[in-house]
Amino acid sequence: MRKLRYLYHGSSKRVNILMPQLADDWRFEAGRHFGVYATSNRDLALAFALGGVPDETGTCHRIIREKDRKPFKMTFVRGHPKFGSKGYLYKLSSRGFHHVGGDQWVCENPVKPIKIAEINVDDYIHLFRYATLKERCEIERAFRKQIKRSKENKINKW
């Protein structure tokens, strides 16, 4: 994959330096690295800038599947965006990032943004949708299977 000049990161929090963190994407290995995640897809970063508010069970679960990419939508399985609040779109130099799959890039070091744009969440609600009841059941079933498999793998390693 060709190296891009700029990448994007979206968050509901404003910071001057993006610090590496351990990501936990139960579906893909590319989403389990320690680092600062960025994307070549501006809409994807904006969707993460919408933030997430837990539902009545205390859960906020959002997902982006291949079928939700044209047109782009982040699917809220549980919870909802932070309506009425601010989000932040970070424009980053691609220096130090390596491609980990799809639209995702990771840098293991702290990253100073080139530019930070404050957004109104309500201006970007077209980038999300709620999961249907059927989708929610399918996604949560797959999640439970993955958790069970993960626990079994940890037990089998001992």
Question: What residue ranges belong to the model's regions?
Answer:
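Conserved NAD+-utilizing ADP-ribose enzyme module
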Residues: 1, 32, 51-158
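Glycine-rich nucleotide phosphate-binding loop and flanking beta-alpha elements
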Residues: 14-15, 46, 96-98
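Compact, glycine/acidic-enriched structural inserts
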Residues: 42, 46-49
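ADP-ribose/NAD+-binding catalytic cleft of ART/PARP-like enzymes
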Residues: 1-32, 50-51
